[in-house]
């Protein structure tokens, strides 16, 4: 099993237990990011998401009001919601990309130019669809670490989460 940690905060943010998909159904961005499909699960009800996932026609309306319904990846990795304005995001992402580029220049210089090209397209997509996104950070609440990008695709009841690959460290267990 692989676990993905944030490069700067060291927070666990995802694992390979979730299929990695092309971000926003755009294969051109797969060199810089991956997307995972989440499910809503009833915490403490131990249905393991079966009753609430899209494929099984899950119906949230039949949830016991005393049971908390959570997004599986957000809950498992203790991701914290981070409200951002477009201006805040623009300021953050410029600094974060500079930080990642500096790290890449030190550790993997041949990756710098492809990263810059792809991440530019990624950021353009986020800014063009900004109101459709929710943002998360790892459990340490390190606001200088990487963001997790959440958005809802079509009529899905659970968000898709998108991660920038170069901001993650892969660990095998």
Swiss-Prot record:
Q: Where in the cell is it found?
A: Cytoplasm
What Pfam families is this protein classified in? Answer: TCTP
The TCTP domain covers which part of the protein?
A: 1-173
Kindly state which keywords UniProt assigns to this record, in alphabetical order. Calcium, Cytoplasm
Q: Per its UniProt record, what SUPFAM superfamilies does this chain match?
A: Mss4-like
What family classification does the UniProt entry report for this protein?
Belongs to the TCTP family.
Report what the protein is called.
Translationally-controlled tumor protein homolog
Could you tell me which species this protein originates from?
A: Theileria annulata
> What is this organism's lineage?
Eukaryota, Sar, Alveolata, Apicomplexa, Aconoidasida
């Amino acid at each position: 099993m692989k676990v993905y940690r944030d490069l700067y905060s060291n927070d666990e943010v995802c694992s390979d237990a979730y299929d990695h998909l092309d971000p926003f159904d755009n294969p051109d961005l797969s060199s810089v990011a991956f997307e995972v499909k989440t499910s809503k699960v009833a915490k403490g009800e131990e249905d393991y998401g079966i009753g609430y996932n899209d494929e099984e026609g899950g119906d949230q309306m039949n949830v016991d009001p005393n049971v908390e319904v959570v997004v599986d990846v957000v809950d498992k990795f203790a991701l914290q919601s981070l409200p951002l304005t477009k201006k805040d995001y623009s300021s953050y992402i410029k600094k974060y990309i500079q930080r990642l580029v500096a790290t890449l220049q030190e550790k993997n210089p041949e990756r710098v130019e492809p990263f810059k090209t792809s991440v530019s397209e990624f950021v353009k997509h986020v800014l063009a669809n900004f109101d459709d996104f929710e943002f998360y950070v790892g459990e340490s609440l390190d606001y200088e670490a990487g963001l997790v990008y959440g958005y809802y695709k079509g009529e899905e009841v659970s968000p898709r989460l998108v991660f920038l690959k170069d901001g993650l460290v892969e660990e095998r267990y």
